[in-house]
Amino acid sequence: VLTEDDKNHIRAIWGHVDNNPEAFGVEALTRLFLAYPATKTYFAHFDLNPGSAQIKAHGKKVVDALTQAVNNLDDIPDALAKLADLHAEKLRVDPVNFGLLGHCILVTIAAHNHGPLKADVALSMDKFLTKVAKTLVAHYR
């Protein structure tokens, strides 16, 4: 459950992320592909170089979807229902990958934070990203 403090932390941090969604998304995806090379199999048709148009576009899509979740913190499942159906029914992405991407997003946030990421803020973001991953995984049942 996201508390009001969690929601405030998430909105504050996400304001920085959403200022440059393409670049942030590219960095998070690049981290994902480097740390977890098996995730590249879902993007075999992409040019996986960080500067490629495909990675830039997909990185922006990822951030835009998370922005939609941030804008609907009280009903993330409804906000991400279509995206969850797409990944479960059409793309058939292994659900473990949502947690891996969430971790890479959190690392990217920490890397761009001015100074150390405070523990309470990091915890709020982790709770949010976990809730997003659980929302997406729920459509696999």
Swiss-Prot record:
* Gene Ontology process terms (BP): hydrogen peroxide catabolic process
Q: Which CDD domains match?
A: Hb-alpha-like
Family, according to the entry, reads as follows: Belongs to the globin family.
Entries under SUPFAM superfamilies matching the protein: Globin-like
Q: Which UniProt keywords apply?
A: Heme, Iron, Metal-binding, Oxygen transport, Transport
Q: Which Gene3D superfamilies match?
A: Globins
Where on this chain does heme b bind? H87
Alphabetical list of Pfam families matching this protein: Globin (PF00042)
Relate the protein's function as given in its record.
Answer: Involved in oxygen transport from the lung to the various peripheral tissues.
InterPro entries with a match to the protein in the record: Globin, Globin-like_sf, Globin/Proto, Hemoglobin_a-typ, Hemoglobin_oxygen_transport, Hemoglobin_pi
Q: Taking every annotated instance into account, which residue ranges of this chain make up the domain Globin?
A: 1-141
Kindly provide the name given to this protein in its UniProt entry: Hemoglobin subunit alpha-1
Question: What residues does O2 bind to?
Answer: H58
Binding partners and assembly: Heterotetramer of two alpha chains and two beta chains.
An annotated GO cellular component of this protein is: hemoglobin complex
Quote the tissue specificity entry.
Red blood cells.
**What GO molecular function terms would the record report?**
haptoglobin binding; heme binding; iron ion binding; organic acid binding; oxygen binding; oxygen carrier activity; peroxidase activity
